[in-house]
Regions:
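Non-catalytic, mostly N-terminal accessory regions of nucleic-acid modification and defense proteins
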Residues: 1-208, 267, 271-280, 373-376, ...
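Conserved Class I SAM-dependent methyltransferase catalytic core
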Residues: 19, 32-48, 252, 270, ...
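Short, contiguous acidic/charged loop-to-helix segments that flank catalytic cores in large enzymes
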Residues: 30, 300-321, 346-353, 375-381, ...
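Active-site catalytic pocket residues across diverse enzymes, especially alpha/beta-hydrolases
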Residues: 53, 230-234, 334
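C-terminal, active-site-flanking charged/polar segments
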Residues: 66, 367-368, 378-443
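Hydrophobic alpha-helical scaffolding
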Residues: 140, 162, 216, 244-248, ...
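Conserved S-adenosyl-L-methionine
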Residues: 187-291, 296-300, 305-313, 325, ...
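Short helix-terminating capping/connector loops at secondary-structure junctions
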Residues: 234-239, 337-338, 407-408
Length: 535
């Protein structure tokens, strides 16, 4: 009887990345974690811009045929293909940078072909300058068979199969963080903000149009999710003007690649640099700011910053911790009339004693609008609970995205989402939870309802979830912004009928003791049966 053919293995992105990781680990001269990651991300980038180019050319050919023109005609190709402009962010790639050229290059020439592709891309498009390390592949001098195996594996990744709207470079970056994260710490900038956390921030501050800024932009995830939100509302992503800065060189390159893949125009500066000592967007004000800066960053301070204008009226942040330096930097870049910011910080920033004066000034000047404590274990490289801060330059009311807002000048909304841990992520090496769409929508609705006309801020509360709090109460608590000081906690022990509970426990203990006596008798009988009685 003939054997049945084995079922074809379903392509899985994680399986492909796992294979690439193993090939890179086994390859000689593959370099450090960061060099391995750079090579992998660059290959994925080339794969996806190449596939988008091929899709764009196919659509162009179809359009030409519909008009009775032959796409194979040399004159037609010269007229329509050489200078074709695509409106969806697709690059008109030079021949050397096309994936078909790369995948068909014999193994011995792949290292040179790949670096040539990167050089040509930077020559063709100013937005791609600074994306790549010169000699990424040739300086490593990977064996021909090693680089060929990796390229063939990357060739299996298709945006058609794995989803055009997913942050695929981000997913690859996230995968490599998890697999190679021995040296990847948040202080070094090697941090990837989970999609659900970015979606929560975007859902709350609604960055639909205008200037959007991230002073620690990482891999560009804040920008990507904002664009997704605009598309979901049938909006025009071109009405978002993206500005950002990133200190870490490798992460800066990743952000440029990530945004380029999405066709999102951006202003990330000519190079990577510190937002504190070399603010690339000094003097600019933004409608929206979204950020996940490094938690509790040390080494940020320079004596030249002592009298910096960003600290004026608030106080000098402690040199030992950058949390409040980030807050004041963000505030300095918000549009004075109506700018709004959502950003993440470690929970210690809510009540640190050495920042109490700055915190008091922020609260009294009406800059802090909401404090949201998030569940633990949302992040890849840390399991701590963190806080989402929302600053708003306009708490006096008005119209915002079609909603009539009331005056919240003397109030702050506190939310505690730490109990939202029921959605565990399957298949992770460590426990990890996520926020699902319904939870994100609920959190945003709580915040937006609190802002809106018709809500009584003095009586806006649900125990153990949220509460609107006035300035007087916050002052009585020493200007602490810790939600647990304000949100009511229900003592569930008070709901227990102790008499009934003790009767239940007593009954269970009787059953246990009866079973023990029965077991003891059976044991004694067994020993007697073999002639060894137990006195």
């Amino acid at each position: 009887m003939a054997k049945k053919k084995a079922a074809a293995k379903v392509l899985n992105l994680d399986n492909i990345l796992f294979n690439c990781r193993d090939y890179l680990r086994a390859a000689r001269n593959s370099g450090s974690f960061f060099e391995k990651r750079d090579m992998m991300l660059t290959l994925v980038f080339l794969r996806f811009i190449g596939e988008k180019y091929e899709d764009g050319i196919e659509k162009l050919c179809q359009t030409l045929r519909e008009r009775g023109l032959d796409p194979a005609d040399e004159n037609i190709r010269a007229a329509f293909f050489d200078d074709a402009t695509f409106t969806d962010g697709t690059y008109n790639l030079p021949p050397e940078a096309r994936w078909t050229t790369i995948i068909n290059t014999p193994a011995p020439g792949l290292n040179v072909a790949l670096d040539t592709a990167l050089v040509r891309l930077e020559e063709e498009d100013p937005q791609l300058r600074g994306c790549f390390i010169k000699g990424t592949f040739t300086t490593r001098n990977l064996a021909a068979n090693d680089i060929k195996k990796i390229v063939d594996e990357v060739n299996k990744i298709s945006h058609k199969q794995f989803g055009a709207e997913k942050d695929l470079i981000g997913r690859v970056y996230e995968y490599f963080l998890k697999e190679f994260a021995v040296n990847a710490t948040k202080e070094e900038g090697e941090f990837y903000t989970p999609h659900d956390v970015v979606q929560l921030i975007a859902a709350m501050i609604e960055p639909y149009e205008g200037r959007l800024y991230d002073p620690a932009c990482g891999s560009g995830g804040m920008f990507i999710q904002s664009a997704e939100l605009v598309r979901a509302r049938q909006g025009d992503v071109n009405r978002i003007n993206i500005y950002g800065q990133e200190k870490d060189a490798a992460t800066y390159r990743l952000a440029k690649m990530n945004l380029a893949l999405r066709g999102l125009s951006h202003h990330l500066g000519e190079t990577n640099d510190s937002s504190f000592t070399h603010d690339l967007h000094a003097g600019m004000h933004f409608h929206y700011i979204m950020a996940n800066p490094p938690f509790n960053l040390k080494g940020w301070y320079s004596p030249a910053l002592e009298h910096d204008a960003r600290w004026t009226d608030y106080g000098l942040p402690p040199a030992s911790n950058a949390n409040y330096a980030w807050i004041l930097h963000i505030l300095s870049h918000l549009k004075p009339a109506d700018g709004i910011a959502g950003f993440l910080l470690a929970n210690g920033a809510l009540s640190d004693s050495d920042t109490a004066e700055i915190r008091r000034n922020l609260i009294q000047k009406g800059k802090v609008e909401a404090i949201v404590v998030l569940p633990r274990e949302l992040f890849i490289t840390t399991d701590i609970s963190v806080t989402l801060w929302i600053l708003n330059q306009n708490k006096k009311g008005g119209v915002y995205h079609g909603r009539n807002l009331r005056d919240r000048t003397h109030e702050i909304l506190f939310m505690d989402l730490r109990a939202w841990t029921e959605n565990a992520v399957k298949g992770e090496n460590k426990k990890k939870v996520r926020l699902v769409a319904a939870q994100i929508e609920r959190a945003a609705a709580i915040y937006h309802t609190w802002q809106s006309v018709g809500t009584d801020g003095t009586d806006y509360a649900v125990p153990e979830l949220y509460r609107s709090v006035g300035m007087d109460e916050i002052e009585r608590n020493g200007w602490s912004l810790t939600p647990s000081k304000y949100i009511a906690f229900i003592d569930h022990d008070l709901e227990i009928d102790y008499a009934a509970e003790m009767a239940r426990i007593q009954g269970e203990m009787r059953d246990v003791m009866k079973q023990e006596k029965k077991s003891q008798r059976m044991l004694e009988d067994a020993f007697r049966g073999i002639g060894y009685g137990i006195d």
